[in-house]
Every structure is written in structure tokens, then in C-alpha cells.
Regions:
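Alpha-helical packing segments of well-folded alpha/beta enzyme cores
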Residues: 316-323, 359-362, 366, 419, ...
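C-terminal capping/lid segments that line or modulate ligand- or cofactor-binding pockets
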Residues: 40-70, 90, 394-414, 509-511, ...
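Aromatic-residue-lined binding/catalytic grooves and analogous aromatic/hydrophobic interfacial grooves
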Residues: 13, 21-145, 153-463, 485, ...
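Active-site neighborhood of glycoside hydrolase catalytic domains
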Residues: 469-501, 514-528, 536, 540-579, ...
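C-terminal accessory segments of proteins
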Residues: 448-479, 534
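Hydrophobic (often cysteine-bearing) scaffold residues that line and stabilize catalytic clefts
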Residues: 356-359, 399, 471, 493, ...
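Compositionally biased, intrinsically disordered low-complexity segments enriched in Pro/Arg/Gln/His
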Residues: 8-10
């Protein structure tokens, strides 16, 4: 997959207008002084089902419509994993006997088939009619009335002549409501995606002018043979508009339906849509769905709500605001004026507390808005291009978990409920993977999913993702953390954990020369030893996943008849290995040499998020893990690699390394004006990893919790000496508010159950760079329902 989606233009500097007062910015929100010229810069709204990308152009108000279920059929839908279990024994023999390339034959010849690619639906367009008002839609520039939609020069958007920008133009996104507002003089456009009614709501007011409204399928990368069907019906209130896009060589289609209501004026059919003359305001309600056969348009139109904008917002707002507002960050910035800057200008101040505060709020907003029917994809729930990198899929071996990593501490159960929905909908496919590939009971997760299929089908010599057996434990772990916060695990989670343990019981039947269980074949995403092929033995991530899966299943289901067997098997797993460089080795097998320059940090799974290796209980292994982090390169500068590095560094109490990893992203031009992110520097490849993972880094550097431990400011970068964090959920059942200065920490705890916790703090200001010593611990007893306020001096011992 190419890295490039087109080079973004250099950002235009923001010059405040001296004749107008400085804009106020209600926090948390962001704004821009000009419309979005690129879809990547469009402001985003979403409810976890629908997504909207809002450009805010007064001359041609465009909203790209997305939906989590929109994936293009490509022949992969019904493919099953190949039957390779019969080849497993000979492969294990070969690897154990020293054949370092034997795994390349396991699945060789199986085709590499990408999952169904995620794609946009269409864009709603509300365009001021040309001066020659008799020109019908489809005949003017930018209108397309052809029978097929396709990529071509017309798919690239150019702002119409006369597009208004300047001191009176402003577009804003309010994170607390999910509403985008664009205004220019008396013209105003408001858009949000309703959580209550599952509909995209667009309301435009302004001078009565001729306006053209239609659903436009022409977007970059659209298939040339995408069949387009349209329907327009006038109503007393306005019009009903529909657009059906039938996928090539498929009975499936995505169908968009809109209801237009005009206040005053007249509405007439024109070309591919309608022309509105003299209306004071327009309300456009839009939905899209993917389905086989012919949709019942009358039923789809009738199902849209019959309410005005304010009533729709009144139903939506409590649902969104209560979720977003549970957790909030405030950072002290020496220059208060930075708080009011446009996002594009604030990004020019990468070291400022104001930027980190806004990106924390934006990331929290975006991950919430992308989570509902499913968790966030590689692009959240948004894209403006049919050619999405890596199919816009769920990449599970790193990216998905990084994106949802803030949900537990950040008190966003909606995100983890969506994550659980993805898993529960695929368990049958995971069982197929375990049986077909390994001849085992239980479940094995794939490395890629389109949201429909969970079958393993990625077979590639340099990316043998079918050998990755740690995926089920890795993906279930966020749900295990959520269960710790709640104090109980749901039955579905207990059952899934038991199935992971069943897989390991059947799979882990071989031993190494030391008598310990050998994990063979084994794969450390997406790296290889310097002196062996990708498929090998005893990847550290696999060891950690197997141990965690077996012990967790036994803890959650102590009465299970195999619980003792699971504990025994966990006890026979190999120990972690420390290599000649003093680093935690990526493979715990004699003779395998490290490859340090890589974007993934799979072998540090026992540090983050498992907390099996930490500075308090396992200081020797923590030091080795820190050495491994020091030696790790960033390879191709992927955003997820930098932020994964920061998460591990925070667990190891290294604030300077957290700061450096954040700087790699904030200095690297990874963020679009929308505050959605890119996969690579210079805003290359639209991707949500950085935007969604950054709040997790902030939370980890400020607060860490385990069932019996609380660590305050474990890895605070020096750039943020003062601040406040509200609404953090801890894994011992309390909600935490935190305020800190260079001299003092105040922690307010609201426990929901009794607990006795070990309390530690991070290093005081001015401490040398590197991993801080764990310091002394104190103990705090919490009683359910009894709030507790702790005030601690920031001193070197880390005590109370």
C-alpha cells in the first residue's frame, strides 16, 4: 500500500484581524479561519455508526457521509482459513531442530487476500446556484449526472471562485456536543450526527438565495463501474432524495436517503437533485445503509425523524455530553492566548501545553465518535477516499488496542462495548482459525478484519500473520481491565477467556531443550530475528499472552474443571530472556539475535499493558525492558510506534522518554487541521492511530492503577509542571481527580468498593532523565462511598 494520499500544502499562517476582537474558544473545541480544502481537514462528527466529514464551505457546503458497515465486496467475504493443521507437527519438528526458515512453508501457496476495503458513501452538497440560475444540476461545474461514478480529475475538489474566507469566516467543532458550525456573515451551517436518532443532521440558514441540493457519489477512488441509481420526490415541506450505489459484480449496494425541509421559498426538481429558491433555512437529514437487493425507499424516508434541528439536538446532546464529559484535562500554559488559536496554528507550537490539552480532548472526542456498532477502524469511522490504506480495516496486532487504550482509565465504556461487539461477532470465525490452522479447540484472532469476517487469510512470507497466536489474549485484555474497574467480569468475557486457555492447552504440547514448554511456531508482530525468518520460536509476546490467558482464565473461572491444568501449564512456560545487551529479548530462544530497528514493540507486552513487568515487583526485568526500549529504533516513523513507545516508557517511569516520543509526533506534522492524524510524518496517509492513542499516553504519564496499586505522576514530562485531570477510573474501583503543581499533588478518590492500595508517586521536578527509582510506598485504605482526599508533597522518596 502506498504511503501517500497526496501531499498536503504547507499550512497558511493565521493572522488575527486587528479590527476584530480575538475569537473566544469555548473549551473543549477547535476552530479554523477557512473552509477545508482537503477532505483530510474536514471536521468530524459521528455516533459510532454514521460519520460525517464537514468542509464548511459557504459556496458549496459539502458533508462526506460514512458508515461503519460500508465495505466493498472483493471476493474475501466467504474465504475460510486453509486446512494446515496436518502440517503443524512436521513444522514444529523442523523449527525445534534448528531449521530457521521452516515456517515459510506453512501456508506457502495460500493467496494473500486483503479484507473488504472500507469506503465513503457519497457527499451531500448544498451549493449556491450559479448566476445563470437556469443551469440544471449535472450541467454545471462540479455536478455529475452520469450513470456511473468514477475517480478522475473531477473527483478532486477545488473551491469555487468567490468562496468566502477572511475575518468574518469561522468554522468550529464543539467536542462537548459533536456539532460543527461554519459561518460567514449571515450564512450559517450546523451539522451533527445524532446518537439518539442515528441520523446526520445539517441545518443551513442565511440570505434567501437559489441553492442546489443533491447527493454526489463522485469521490476519489470510486470504482469506474459503480452503478448509480437516483430518486427525487417533491413533498409539501421540500423533497425526498435517494442515491443507490451498487457494487460491481455484487447484489450488495449502499443506499443513502435524505429528507430536505425548506422554510419558505420553493423547491423544484433539477438534474440529479433539487433547486431551492428563496428559502430562509434548509434542514437535511441523511442516513446510509448497506444491504442486498432493492431498498424500500418509502420505508427508509418514512423512518427519518420528523423533528426540527433544536429538537433533534435536544435528544442527542445529553447522550454525547455525558460520555465525553466524564474525564477532562487542563494544562497550564504560560501563554494563555494559545488557548484561542485555530487548531492549524496551535499545531505550530508543538511543545505547548495548550496543544496537548486540545489534542487530548480531540482524541477523546474522536475515539468516542468512532465507536458504536464497531470500535474505531484505522481511519476511525471516516474516509473521503475509496482507496483507504490497508483497507481501512481493523489491524489488531497493535493499532486497534492502541486506539482504545484510553477507554478504561478515561471512563469511556462506550468504546469498550464497541470493542466487545467486534469480538463477540467473530468468535465462530476465531474457532475456525484455531481448528484449521492448529488443530486446536478454542479461539485464535486474525491480524486484520473488515468488521464482518474474523477468519485468518493474510499469508505473506514477510508478514506471516497467520502464525500470530497471541491475538485473542491481546484483544481481550482491554475488556479484562474494564472488568477490574467494575469489580466483575461479564459471562461472555469469562467464556472467551476460557476458550483462549483451551487453545493453549491443545497448542502448547512441545518442549524446548530446557524442559520448558516451547511456543512453536511463534511470531512477534511484525518483526523477525536478525538471523532467522519471521516464523520462529518463543516470541516474548507469545509467552506473555499464553501466561496471561491461562492465569486469567483460572482466576475468572476458578471452578472450571481445567482451572488447575491451566495454572500448571502457565507455570511451565519459558522464562523471559535477557540478551547480551542487557535488554529484554524479543525471542526467548538460544541463538536468536535481535532486530532493534522496528516500529512495533510486541515484546514489551508484559510491560504495557499487562503490567506483569514493572519497576515495583520485578525491578530487574523492568531494567531489562527499559534497555530494550532504549535500543529500539523507530524504523519508518509510524505514529503508532512512537506512541506505543511512550506508553511503555510511562510504565517504566521515564518521563523524558515519554516527552521525546510525544515530540516525535507533535514535531513531525502528524496532525491534519481537523486534528485527526496521519500514519506517517508530513500528514502522509490518513490514520487515527495518533489521534486516538494520544489520550492514553497522557493518562499513563499522569496516573497508573492496578487492582492494588495507584501511582501518581509516574512519568510527567517537564513541559507540564501544572495541571488537573478529572474523572479517571481506576482498576481498584474508584474515580480519581488529580491536581498537581511543582510542589504538591492532590488526589481526590471516590471509591465504589472497599480497597487497600499501595500508593506511589513519580519523581520530583528536576530529577535526572531516565527511569526513576520506584521510591517508597505507603498504604491507603478506601471504603466504598467514603471520599478520600490525599495531599502529597513532591519529594524524592515518593512517599506520602
Amino acid at each position: 500500500m502506498s504511503r501517500s494520499t497526496g501531499n498536503p500544502s504547507p499550512r497558511k499562517p493565521y493572522t488575527p484581524n486587528p479590527s476584530t476582537p480575538a475569537p473566544s474558544l469555548p473549551n473543549p473545541s477547535t476552530w479554523e479561519p477557512r473552509p477545508a480544502a482537503r477532505w483530510e481537514d474536514a471536521f468530524l462528527s459521528g455516533n459510532g455508526h454514521h460519520g460525517a466529514m464537514v468542509h464548511g464551505d459557504p459556496a458549496d457546503d459539502r458533508v462526506i457521509v460514512n458508515h461503519h458497515t460500508l465495505v466493498r465486496p472483493n471476493g474475501s467475504e466467504d474465504l475460510r482459513p486453509p486446512e494446515l493443521a496436518g502440517e503443524l507437527g512436521p513444522l514444529q519438528d523442523a523449527l525445534l531442530s534448528g531449521n530457521t526458515r521452516a515456517a515459510e512453508r506453512f501456508g506457502a501457496g495460500s493467496p494473500l487476500v486483503w479484507v473488504q476495503p472500507f469506503h465513503p458513501a457519497f457527499q451531500t452538497r448544498v451549493r449556491r446556484a450559479p448566476a445563470e440560475s437556469g443551469t440544471p444540476l449535472g450541467a454545471g461545474a462540479g455536478a455529475h449526472g452520469t450513470a456511473h461514478a468514477g475517480a478522475g480529475p473531477e473527483a478532486e475538489y477545488t473551491a469555487p471562485a468567490g468562496t468566502a474566507t477572511g475575518p468574518s469566516y469561522r468554522r468550529e467543532l464543539d467536542f462537548t456536543s459533536g456539532e460543527t458550525v461554519a459561518s460567514h456573515g449571515p450564512w450559517r451551517s450546523r451539522v451533527f450526527v445524532s446518537r439518539a436518532d442515528d441520523v446526520i443532521v445539517q441545518h443551513i440558514t442565511g440570505p434567501a438565495a437559489d441553492t442546489e441540493v443533491w447527493l454526489d457519489p463522485v469521490l476519489p477512488g470510486a470504482p469506474a463501474n459503480l452503478a448509480v441509481g437516483r430518486s427525487t420526490v417533491l413533498t409539501p415541506q421540500g423533497a425526498r432524495i435517494a442515491l443507490r450505489l451498487r457494487y460491481p459484480e455484487s447484489d450488495l449496494s449502499c443506499t443513502g436517503v435524505s429528507v430536505l425541509r425548506a422554510e419558505g421559498g420553493t423547491v423544484s426538481v433539477s438534474g440529479d437533485g433539487v433547486r431551492v429558491a428563496g428559502a430562509r433555512s434548509l434542514l437535511l437529514l441523511t442516513r446510509v445503509r448497506r444491504s442486498p437487493g432493492e431498498p424500500d425507499l418509502d420505508a427508509e424516508w418514512a423512518a427519518l425523524p420528523d423533528d426540527d434541528y433544536d429538537a433533534l439536538m435536544a435528544r442527542h446532546l445529553p447522550l454525547h455530553r455525558s460520555a465525553f464529559g466524564r474525564c477532562a484535562l487542563t494544562l497550564h500554559d504560560e501563554d494563555p492566548a494559545r488557548q484561542g488559536l485555530p487548531g492549524s496554528e496551535l499545531l505550530r507550537h508543538p511543545g505547548s501545553p495548550a496543544l496537548l490539552e486540545r489534542l487530548f480532548a480531540a482524541g477523546r472526542y474522536h475515539v468516542l465518535s468512532a465507536s458504536g456498532a464497531l470500535p474505531p477502524r484505522l481511519t476511525g469511522v471516516w474516509t473521503g477516499d475509496w482507496d483507504t490504506a490497508w483497507s481501512g480495516a481493523f489491524t489488531t496486532n497493535a493499532n486497534l488496542n492502541l486506539q482504545v487504550a484510553s477507554a478504561t482509565a478515561g471512563n469511556l465504556p462506550e468504546v469498550l462495548d464497541a470493542h466487545a461487539r467486534l469480538i463477540e461477532g467473530q468468535l465462530d470465525h476465531w474457532r475456525e482459525n484455531a481448528r484449521a490452522l492448529f488443530g486446536a479447540r478454542g479461539i485464535v484472532a486474525p491480524s486484520h478484519s473488515d468488521g464482518e469476517s474474523g477468519r485468518t487469510r493474510h499469508f505473506q512470507r514477510a508478514y506471516p500473520l497467520h502464525l500470530w497466536t497471541a491475538g485473542a489474549d491481546w484483544l481481550l485484555h482491554p475488556l479484562c481491565e474494564q472488568a477490574q474497574c467494575r469489580g466483575a467480569a461479564p459471562e461472555a468475557l469469562v467464556s472467551a477467556c476460557a476458550e483462549v486457555a483451551d487453545f493453549y492447552t491443545d497448542f502448547l504440547t512441545r518442549e524446548g531443550p530446557d524442559g520448558a514448554v516451547a511456543i512453536v511456531p511463534s511470531y512477534s508482530p511484525e518483526n523477525r530475528p536478525e538471523n532467522a525468518s519471521w516464523g520462529t520460536l518463543n516470541a516474548t509476546m507469545d509467552i506473555a499472552a499464553a501466561r496471561h490467558a491461562l492465569t486469567t482464565a483460572a482466576e475468572l473461572a476458578p471452578a472450571h474443571p481445567d482451572a488447575d491444568r491451566w495454572r500448571d501449564l502457565a507455570g511451565r512456560l519459558p522464562r523471559y530472556r535477557i540478551n547480551a545487551d542487557g535488554a529484554l529479548a524479543e525471542w526467548a530462544w538460544p541463538g536468536l539475535r535481535e532486530t532493534y530497528d522496528h516500529r512495533h514493540l510486541s515484546h514489551l507486552y508484559p510491560v504495557w499493558p499487562l503490567d506483569e513487568i514493572n519497576p515495583y515487583d520485578t525491578p530487574g526485568l523492568a531494567a531489562a525492558a527499559h534497555r530494550a526500549l532504549e535500543l529500539r529504533g523507530s524504523e519508518n516513523d509510524s505514529a503508532h510506534g512512537h506512541l506505543h513507545h511512550a506508553l511503555v516508557a510511562a510504565r517504566l517511569r521515564d518521563g523524558a522518554r515519554v516527552s521525546a516520543a510525544l515530540a516525535s509526533v507533535l514535531d513531525g506534522d502528524f496532525f491534519h487541521d481537523s486534528l485527526m492524524s496521519a500514519h506517517y510524518p508530513d500528514r502522509n496517509v490518513y490514520n487515527a492511530d495518533a489521534a486516538h492513542a494520544l489520550p492514553a499516553v497522557v493518562l499513563e504519564m499522569l496516573v497508573q492503577s492496578a487492582p492494588g496499586r495507584l501511582v501518581l505522576l509516574p512519568a510527567l514530562p517537564a513541559a507540564y509542571p501544572r495541571g488537573a485531570l478529572r474523572g479517571v477510573r481506576t482498576r481498584f474501583g474508584a474515580v480519581l481527580d488529580l491536581v498537581w503543581t511543582p510542589e504538591e499533588i492532590t488526589a481526590s478518590l471516590r471509591p465504589t468498593r472497599d480497597a487497600r492500595i499501595e500508593l506511589r508517586t513519580g519523581p520530583p521536578p528536576g530529577s535526572p532523565a531516565g527511569p526513576a527509582e520506584p521510591g517508597e510506598a505507603s498504604w491507603v485504605t478506601l471504603t466504598a462511598g467514603a471520599d478520600r482526599v490525599l495531599t502529597l508533597r513532591r519529594r524524592a522518596t515518593g512517599g506520602r
